[in-house]
Amino acid sequence: MGKHVRLRKGFDINLAGKASPTIATTDQPDVFAIKPTDFQGLYLPRVLVNVGDTVKAGTPLFRDKKFEKVVFTAPVSGEVVEIKRGEKRKLLEVRILADKSFQHVEFRKYSAGDLASISREEAQEQLLASGVWANLIQRPYGVIADPNETPKAIFISAFDSHPLAPDYELIFKGEEQYFQAGVDILKKFTAGSIHVNLRGDTQSSIFSGAKGVEFNYFTGPHPSGCVGVQIHHIDPINRGEIAWTINPYGVIQIGKLFLNGIYDTSRIVALVGSEVMKPQYYKTWTG
């Protein structure tokens, strides 16, 4: 049974520049970059492409030398135009000139009814090959999840309490089937619970209908939406234990991978702040 937690300590900072509930479209940027520094715990990246190579969304760009099956893939299709390195040839970023044709590597596609028959090994292989595995974060330490480990539980914070945080009900509207599919895949990786943590003082139309999860409800000021705080109150990590976390965007990306057979990096972000002339939401892509 889920928990109801009220946080009394914390503070909500009321900043100017909150995004209006409108979603604007933008042109796809010309150049995308994937940086190893964006992935905490990446031991030593090994480049898998060369300048001039043509890639599709989902093509591996580099991999983790410690866990060689963990690859990091192109967010869009195009041409690799630069492999930027720093001191001692440290990889800084891989830059892609987008062709704006939205070509994808084709992964195996499943119907929603077939997801239950997928084994953990099959699910893990597709998550690793597509680059979607990088959404899974292992605690303690907050690093990319070790494919050889089994977490005691998986935690999903379904709201954000940071100042000027985006409205999840807006940016994930219409993604319910993909969220459910992502949950169905995640259940294969733990014998424990999939915890979906909701804001206790509002009703979620996006996440509250998910099946096979344990709902927990949090009220109170920031940091009530931070998954680490939520883990502390729901099921603290003891010595020798690990847990995995993933944000709703990652869960939905897993769902799209298995239902549509593609690595989909499109997302909606909020451009906010007191210096922004027109704070609002924009549809864009990772990278």
Predicted features along the sequence, with ranges:
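Short coil-to-beta-strand transition motifs
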Residues: K69-S77
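Short histidine-centered loop motifs in beta-beta connectors
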Residues: P45-T54, G58
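N-terminal, Lys/Arg-enriched amphipathic/low-complexity engagement segments
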Residues: M1-L48, F215-F218
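Short, charged beta-turn/beta-strand-edge "cap" motif at the junction between a beta-strand
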Residues: P60-K69, E87
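Short, solvent-exposed loop/turn positions at domain surfaces
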Residues: Y43, V49, K66-K69, K278
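Buried, small/hydrophobic-residue-enriched core segments of structured protein domains
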Residues: V70, K84-T286
